[in-house]
Amino acid sequence: MSMNNNRTITLAWTGASGAPYGLRLLQCLLAADYQVYLLISSAARVVLATEHGLKLPANPEAAQAALVEHLGCASDKLVVCGKEDWFSPVASGSAAPKQMVVCPCSAGSVAAIAHGMSDNLIERAADVVLKERGQLLLVVRETPFSTLHLENMLKLSHMGVTIMPAAPGFYHQPQSIDDLVDFMVARILDHLGIEQALVPRWGYDQRVRGE
């Protein structure tokens, strides 16, 4: 894969509920012609199979082939990395993309990233983005939040990390679960600076029913 940090991004899926968010975000990033390094935790594969019915092999190359077939995307735009692939570009500040999204992000991943852990490639990639002053978005899916969860998120926010709880809005009058997923993915794309038209934007011409 050729390295172009301006059109390259790291996406991580962890074991939190919300696999459809991560899959839809991947689809949109690829459609926007981004090269995506995808990091998948073992728990994320279980959640993806449970919530979406998509069973990915543990082998990174096989998982990549399965996703390319499932999404119908170009094979050269997606690289699935092993959880201990320390030779991956995302593991080094000299080669890693400047943007990273963890979606969905578990509370455990929030804690590990907040405290600089690098026990797997997801944590290391996040640590690299932080030390290189890149853009890190965490789409946290947990409820309720404990005091410890909130303290970890506050710590990360002070570091410049964008904390985006997976809490879709309803003012666009969603008609399906896909509409709710698109709302969150649209907000993520907005923060990444990627054009999107997944949901109508709020504006003065928007009518609110019931008035």
UniProtKB/Swiss-Prot annotation:
GO function terms (MF aspect): carboxy-lyase activity; flavin prenyltransferase activity
Binding locations of FMN: G15, A16, S17, S41, S106, A107, G108, S109, R141
Binding site for dimethylallyl phosphate: Y171, R187
InterPro entries, alphabetized: Flavin_trans-like, Flavoprotein, UbiX-like
UniProt-listed Enzyme Commission number(s): 2.5.1.129
Keyword terms of this UniProt record: Flavoprotein, FMN, Prenyltransferase, Transferase
Transferase recorded as keyword: yes
Catalytic activity: dimethylallyl phosphate + FMNH2 = prenylated FMNH2 + phosphate
Top EC group: transferase
Similarity annotation: Belongs to the UbiX/PAD1 family.
Function: Flavin prenyltransferase that catalyzes the synthesis of the prenylated FMN cofactor (prenyl-FMN) for 4-hydroxy-3-polyprenylbenzoic acid decarboxylase UbiD. The prenyltransferase is metal-independent and links a dimethylallyl moiety from dimethylallyl monophosphate (DMAP) to the flavin N5 and C6 atoms of FMN.
Name this protein carries in UniProt: Flavin prenyltransferase UbiX
Lineage, broadest ranks: Bacteria, Pseudomonadati, Pseudomonadota, Gammaproteobacteria, Vibrionales
Gene this protein is translated from: ubiX
